[in-house]
Amino acid sequence: PMLLATSHIHHAFKRLKKRSQFGIIIESAEPREPHHFSLLFGYGASAINPYLVNEIITYQSKKAIITESPEKAISNYNKAIAKGIIKVMNKIGISTLHSYRGAQINEALGLSKKLIDKFFCNTPTRIEGIGLYEIEKEINKRHSKAYIHESKLGLPLEIGGDYRWRRDGEAHVVNPSTIATLQQAVRQNK
């Protein structure tokens, strides 16, 4: 939702011809990885405060889960994020954040044309998909998982499987079944 809001505000100011008069400061629990930050900057964010990451790092430092002081650990995290953003910018030949901000150099995958036209004006998309309704359903699902009923407190958090296959996690094309089929085909020389 933060990327939708950022881009929508960015384009609203552009339509009013007032974009250069305002900064868009993001304070959100969503951004965690360089890609998240890159998208937010690419769609108009001027600055980003990933408060939840900072709170988690501070908590882990105070509980001795990590060895650095909170300040040092947050500084290390910020350096890693900056390095990741610079890497993204370098791959497309942009050398300053000023040039990257609002450049919208991404292609959208899996979002409906209607959603793109409303929130991500002029962003190319060749593979259409979900709209605002499906995004709302996903947000509500995640919210209800995050704020579980008291009777379920103490149960472990779900692993998720965003990046690799997990039982009962996000669906992936590469999963144990496809790997087994591939291995069988290779063994049988098919």
Q: Across the structure, where does each feature detected by a protein language model lie?
A:
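Hydrophobic faces of well-ordered beta-strands that scaffold small-molecule active sites
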Residues: F22-S28, F41, I48-P50, H98
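Alpha-helix-loop-beta-strand connector modules within alpha/beta enzyme cores
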Residues: M2-I26, N76-K83, K87
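Conserved, mostly hydrophobic/aromatic
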Residues: I9, L40, T96
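Flexible, glycine-rich loop/tail regions that form catalytic "lids" or insertion modules at the edges
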Residues: H36-F37, A47-P50, K62-K190
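Active-site-adjacent beta->alpha loops and helix N-cap segments on the catalytic face
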Residues: M2-H8, I56-I66
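Active-site-proximal loop/turn and secondary-structure-junction residues that shape catalytic pockets
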Residues: S28-R32, N54
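Catalytic cores of alpha/beta
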Residues: P31-G44
